[in-house]
UniProtKB/Swiss-Prot annotation:
Annotated compartments: Cytoplasm
Protein name, as recorded: Acetylglutamate kinase
EC id: 2.7.2.8
Pfam family, one: AA_kinase
Described purpose of this protein according to its UniProt entry: Catalyzes the ATP-dependent phosphorylation of N-acetyl-L-glutamate.
Primary localization: cytoplasm
Keywords: Amino-acid biosynthesis, Arginine biosynthesis, ATP-binding, Cytoplasm, Kinase, Nucleotide-binding, Transferase
Site feature location: Transition state stabilizer: 36, 249
GO molecular function, one term: acetylglutamate kinase activity
Reaction(s) catalysed (UniProt annotation): N-acetyl-L-glutamate + ATP = N-acetyl-L-glutamyl 5-phosphate + ADP
Length: 293
């Protein structure tokens, strides 16, 4: 008997979705997935809630998610309140000492705790960290140092995360880390996520972005490339098909894959529940780049 409150097709669809997800849940149980959380998914409350629920569900079915986050819009908001003009060069925030103070305050003290609190409310048992905690990430100056306190990853110490993951916690990591002299640097969150994924021997690296994925034609969302081999991703950069802001994201994926990560995904964070759709469905919604077979 069908209840008047339920449509048979709706119930059938729910069963279909759960059935499709089952083999992926079984496959990834106990595996590590590093998620870079940023973009529109951090700004809009509905998307933020969907990401938190996705992460909590991943943890509840045995996946071990690790979250790395940025926080550009929030940083810009506080710089404006403090009358500090943000400056960008080559797509990177030029970071002097005053700006670095704000970056560290916002990412470590504000954004990180908002994410931790959101996950904890859903029972995900999140723990907030920065790259500096336990020397998790050691920074070095990016390029020739002309961008100030903008950093790159010198090395990663995954031992800090192992006991947390083994005990069922969800590490939430801000992309601020100190160099060997103890000076804090602002590191691109994609870069931190990629290097952590490699160090943790993660099954997947997932970058939440404000684009559908890698497009063959940047003006056409319909030209989304759903799956690539590592060599094909490199060729797209060489051919100029991947360009602009997508280049560092694709390069981040390539580096992680070259170090042993099984697959890297560039996913549209503007789509609610993008994480679950990419991980637990056959079609996915973004671009998956596969490592060496």
């Amino acid at each position: 008997m069908v209840s008047p409150d339920h449509e048979p097709m709706d119930d059938a669809l729910r069963v279909s979705v759960l059935s499709e997800a089952l083999p992926y849940i079984q496959r990834f149980a106990g595996r590590r997935i590093v998620v870079k959380y940023g973009g529109a998914a951090m700004v809009h409350a509905e998307l933020q809630s969907a990401v938190f629920r996705d992460l909590a569900l991943l943890r509840s079915v045995g996946v071990q998610p690790v979250v790395v986050h940025g926080g550009g819009p929030e940083i810009n908001h506080w710089l404006k309140r403090l009358d500090i003009d943000p400056e960008f060069r080559e797509g990177l925030r030029v970071t002097d000492a005053a700006t670095m103070d704000v970056v560290e305050m916002v990412l470590v003290g504000r954004v990180n705790k908002q994410i931790v609190n959101g996950l904890n409310r859903l029972g995900a048992r999140a723990v907030g960290l920065s790259g500096s905690d336990g020397c998790l990430v050691e920074a070095r100056a990016w390029g020739d140092g002309s961008h100030g306190l903008v950093g790159d990853v010198a090395r990663v110490n995954p031992d800090v995360l192992e006991p947390l993951l083994d005990r069922g916690y969800v590490p939430v990591i801000s992309s601020v880390a100190a160099n060997a002299e103890g000076v804090a640097h602002n590191i691109n969150a994609d870069t931190v996520a990629g290097e952590l994924a490699a160090a943790l021997e993660a099954e997947k690296l997932i970058l939440l972005t404000d684009t559908p994925g890698i497009l063959r034609d940047r003006e056409s969302p319909e030209s989304l490339i759903r799956q690539l081999k590592l060599s094909e991703a490199r060729q797209l950069i060489d051919d100029g098909i991947v360009a602009g802001g997508m280049t560092p994201k694709t390069e981040c994926c390539i580096r992680a894959l070259a170090q042993g990560v099984s697959a890297a995904h560039i996913v549209d964070g503007r789509v609610a529940h993008a994480l679950l759709l990419e991980v637990f469905t056959d079609a996915g919604i973004g671009t998956m780049v596969l490592g060496r077979s």
